[in-house]
């Protein structure tokens, strides 16, 4: 499956499992993510959600390279109505993450671009590593910074958001924190341990999960 979801302890865990495509989001993946998040939003036993992307080397290393451009190009050139479904449902997913009402912890290791920003920027704990490569490259393919970019890029200090939007430039984890596009830094080799601990700790409530994660930032 391209989206792996399980509940361990009091936390719902999502792994994007399409490493060959750097976890680019297909329509099926968007639908899987919507389904599981709506389910967990209603489930009182799930206090928080954590999400990561499988990389070629293992459980972390590539968060999400964005929307599946190959699919979008093919759908667009053949008049496939699924292209509209993709954007409509992807944007609904982005909005859901912003309004989830529970801590949403994004392990933004490796590539975090375009649609990958859309499924992380609405989170309450946006964690970057020394391997993070972040960008909103939509203008390069003649689109605009979508997936909520108008919201999160406008909240960068000064004119940084405008610069990121117009150039599509890639920034690292430290710059992401400075630009208000990430909340904390974690060395990549520490992620697996924290991910495991999220599923074994006892938490009083969602706020306690959020507090635990923030205590792990370097």
Please report, for each region that a protein language model flagged, where it lies by residue:
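Amphipathic alpha-helical blocks and their helix-capping loop/short-beta junctions
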Residues: 187-218
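Glycine- (often His-adjacent) and acidic-residue-rich active-site loop
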Residues: 53-92, 140-142
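Hydrophobic, secondary-structure "cap" segments at the distal end of domains
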Residues: 150-159
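Conserved CoA-thioester-binding segment of acyl-CoA-metabolizing enzymes
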Residues: 1-52
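Gly/Pro- and small hydrophobic-enriched strand-loop and loop-to-helix capping segments
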Residues: 123-146, 180-195
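Glycine-rich beta-to-alpha active-site loop
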Residues: 97-141, 163-164, 168-173
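Catalytic-core regions built around general acid/base machinery
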Residues: 36, 89-100
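Hydrophobic/aromatic residues within transmembrane alpha-helices
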Residues: 14, 51, 68, 119-120, ...
């Amino acid at each position: 499956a391209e989206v792996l979801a399980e509940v361990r302890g009091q936390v719902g865990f999502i792994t994007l499992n399409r490493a060959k495509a750097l976890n680019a989001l297909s329509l099926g993946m968007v639908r899987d993510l919507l389904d599981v998040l709506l389910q967990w939003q209603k489930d009182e036993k799930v206090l928080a959600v954590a999400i990561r992307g499988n990389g070629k080397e293992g459980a972390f290393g590539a968060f999400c390279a964005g929307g599946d451009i190959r699919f979008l190009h093919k759908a667009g050139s053949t008049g496939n109505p699924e292209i509209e479904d993709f954007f409509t449902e992807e944007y609904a997913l982005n909005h859901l993450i912003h309004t989830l009402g529970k801590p949403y912890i994004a392990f933004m290791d490796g590539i975090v671009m375009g649609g990958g920003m859309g499924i992380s920027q609405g989170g309450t704990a946006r964690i970057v590593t020394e391997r993070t490569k972040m960008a909103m490259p939509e203008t390069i393919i003649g689109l605009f910074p979508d997936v909520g970019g108008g919201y999160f890029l406008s909240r960068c200090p000064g004119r940084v958001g405008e610069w990121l939007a117009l150039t599509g430039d890639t920034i690292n984890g430290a710059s992401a924190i400075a630009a208000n596009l990430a909340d904390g830094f974690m060395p990549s080799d520490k992620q697996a341990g924290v991910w495991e601990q999220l599923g074994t700790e006892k938490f009083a409530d969602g706020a306690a999960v959020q507090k635990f994660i923030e205590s792990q930032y370097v």
